């Protein structure tokens, strides 16, 4: 086991604080509408330019191991805030730096670190309650657009696209962000349930110009196994022919004789029919077939349930207003499933999302949820160069998370003002002793840091701005860094999601509290006796 180096009390905290400052100073340059860019070297390809706090934090690794520990702890703040709220990473970093700085001073002057931490926790609890009480629910589309615009660093086009996407696919719908092949940013919305399986034979196509199968009001047969001959299906096929409605077959596979028979019947004009493979694999396939069945008010034909193909009747088949099948995907629009059944299934999937620990499973469950709950929107981000597209895509991702958070918990005035105003809740916090009161006061001073930093990044004097804001007591009165004007921030569209502000403060205080109560740090000693490099081989070239 390698020898370790240990640092104690003030020396440990000094080293740690230096690491915190290096990381936080790099990250906080990006805060606010006039925040600066950070350029990150890449081992291959062009450097990356970003204004995303968590992207900057993740790149920082320091040579000194003790400083690096401090930096990594604050990096954890940014990552945690990003995971929970999707935005607010820079605010969280600025708050953590402010609390650690003030806390370290108090500990050095002889305060009890544990009481300080208790005081910090009490203060954060009071401010969070105040923020929740003052959060305003989002009432219209323009407010969603404003949140998106603020989070995308003042890019109104991104805000507009996000608001339109959320309006069309609902708050639970999936919105994905991709890189476009062109210079323009565009929005594409797929309504209904779409899965990535196309027609099994091009002979099923009904619209030859677009190479697409289009059915109005079809029956949908959902079968779990392969279909290799149609003998067992004849009763249901005859019933469908008599109803003169189209039929879509979704099965694990349709092969050989069965596929040939379907194609021949289609070409002779006797049968409007198409077949596609079931989406997904293994257990996920079963779940997705069940989703389709619930959406279309059909039944999954499965031997596990004791249902045989021979005994299938028309009322076991699903129905939908429209089905469109292309080479690569199938879309079912307006299935006739009962609203209560679909809502029950959505609640079940939500519960699974809460319980799962795997990011991959969570992503797949969210896709299923969106397909049931409304649809999928794709924002394709365009730009002139690859570097520009990547930078813009970072901002769209941030803005997307921020708008979701705003819909969830409401909005607050932006620009760091909500935290400043919530400080009045600290007047009523009861503490057990003087050291805890100092902990509360640390938070009182620290919550000014985001507003100061936004002002400084915009070229103004932070202390002057904060002083002027303190003169007025209205909750939404603040300074707009974009225009340099004072006024009602709600009216000016300077708003932050309540969830983002709350999460940033809670995560910052949580990690900062741990750093303040640190008394010793242990790191591996650098080895001095490393072996010399191998000499070059002389006379060995054959």
From Swiss-Prot:
GO biological process terms, semicolon-separated: protein refolding
The enzyme's E.C. designation: 5.6.1.7
GO MF assignments: ATP binding; ATP-dependent protein folding chaperone; isomerase activity; unfolded protein binding
Entry keyword set: ATP-binding, Chaperone, Cytoplasm, Isomerase, Nucleotide-binding, Plasmid
Matching PROSITE patterns: CHAPERONINS_CPN60
Annotated compartments: Cytoplasm
GO CC annotations, alphabetized: cytoplasm
Primary localization class, coarse: cytoplasm
Record's signal peptide: none
Residue numbers binding ATP: 30-33, 51, 87-91, 415, 496
Cross-referenced InterPro entries: Chaperonin_Cpn60_CS, Cpn60/GroEL, Cpn60/GroEL/TCP-1, GroEL-like_apical_dom_sf, GROEL-like_equatorial_sf, TCP-1-like_intermed_sf
Catalytic activity: ATP + H2O + a folded polypeptide = ADP + phosphate + an unfolded polypeptide
Biological role stated in the UniProt entry: Together with its co-chaperonin GroES, plays an essential role in assisting protein folding. The GroEL-GroES system forms a nano-cage that allows encapsulation of the non-native substrate proteins and provides a physical environment optimized to promote and accelerate protein folding.
Assembly mode: Forms a cylinder of 14 subunits composed of two heptameric rings stacked back-to-back. Interacts with the co-chaperonin GroES.
Family: Belongs to the chaperonin (HSP60) family.
HAMAP family xref list: CH60 (MF_00600)
Name listed for the protein in its UniProt record: Chaperonin GroEL 3
Name of the gene encoding the protein in the UniProt record: groEL3
């Amino acid at each position: 086991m390698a020898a370790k180096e240990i640092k104690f009390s003030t020396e440990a905290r000094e080293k740690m604080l230096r690491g915190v400052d290096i990381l936080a100073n790099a990250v906080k340059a990006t805060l606010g509408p006039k925040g600066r860019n950070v350029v990150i070297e890449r081992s291959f390809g062009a450097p990356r330019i970003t204004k995303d706090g968590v992207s900057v934090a993740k790149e920082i690794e320091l040579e000194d191991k003790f400083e690096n520990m401090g930096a990594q702890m604050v990096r954890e703040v940014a990552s945690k805030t990003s995971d929970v709220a999707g935005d607010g990473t820079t605010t969280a970093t600025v708050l953590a730096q402010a609390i650690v700085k003030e806390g370290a001073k108090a500990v050095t002057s002889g305060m009890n670190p544990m009481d300080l931490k208790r005081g910090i926790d009490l203060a954060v609890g009071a401010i969070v309650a105040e923020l929740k009480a003052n959060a305003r629910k989002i009432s219209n589309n323009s407010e969603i657009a404003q949140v998106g615009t603020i989070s995308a660093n003042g890019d109104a086009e991104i805000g507009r696209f996000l608001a339109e996407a959320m309006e069309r696919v609902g708050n639970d719908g999936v919105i994905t962000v991709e890189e476009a092949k062109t210079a323009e940013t565009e929005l594409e919305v797929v309504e209904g349930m779409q899965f990535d399986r196309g027609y099994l034979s091009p002979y099923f196509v009904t619209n030859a110009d677009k190479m697409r199968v289009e059915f109005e009001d079809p029956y949908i047969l959902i079968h779990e196994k392969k279909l290799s001959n149609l003998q067992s299906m004849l009763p249901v096929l005859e019933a469908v022919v008599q109803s003169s409605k189209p039929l879509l077959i979704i099965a694990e596979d349709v092969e050989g004789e069965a596929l040939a028979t379907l194609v021949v019947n289609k070409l002779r004009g006797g049968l409007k029919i198409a077949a596609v493979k079931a989406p997904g694999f293994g257990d996920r396939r079963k779940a997705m077939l069940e989703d389709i069945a619930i959406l279309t008010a059909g039944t999954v034909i499965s031997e596990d349930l004791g249902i045989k193909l021979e005994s299938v009747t028309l009322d076991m088949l699903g129905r939908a207003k429209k089905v469109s099948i292309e080479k690569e995907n199938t879309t079912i629009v307006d299935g006739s499933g009962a609203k209560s059944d679909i809502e029950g299934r959505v609640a079940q999937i939500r519960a699974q999302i809460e319980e799962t620990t795997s990011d991959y499973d969570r992503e797949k469950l969210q896709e299923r949820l969106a397909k049931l709950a409304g649809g999928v929107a794709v924002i394709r981000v365009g730009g002139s160069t690859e570097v520009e597209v990547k930078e813009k895509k970072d901002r769209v991702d941030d803005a997307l998370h921020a708008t979701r958070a705003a819909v969830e918990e409401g909005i607050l005035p932006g620009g760091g003002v909500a935290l400043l105003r919530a400080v009045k809740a600290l007047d009523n916090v009861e503490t057990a002793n003087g050291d805890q009161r100092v902990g509360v006061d640390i938070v009182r001073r620290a919550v000014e840091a985001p507003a100061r930093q936004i002002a400084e990044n915009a070229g103004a004097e932070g202390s002057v701005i904060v002083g002027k804001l303190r003169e007025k007591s209205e909750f939404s009165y603040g300074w707009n860094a974009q225009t340099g004007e004072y006024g009602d921030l709600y009216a000016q569209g300077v708003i932050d999601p309540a969830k983002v502000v709350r999460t940033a403060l809670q995560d910052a205080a949580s990690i900062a509290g741990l750093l303040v109560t640190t008394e010793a740090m242990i790191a591996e000693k650098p080895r001095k006796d490393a072996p010399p490099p191998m000499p070059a081989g002389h006379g060995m070239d054959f």
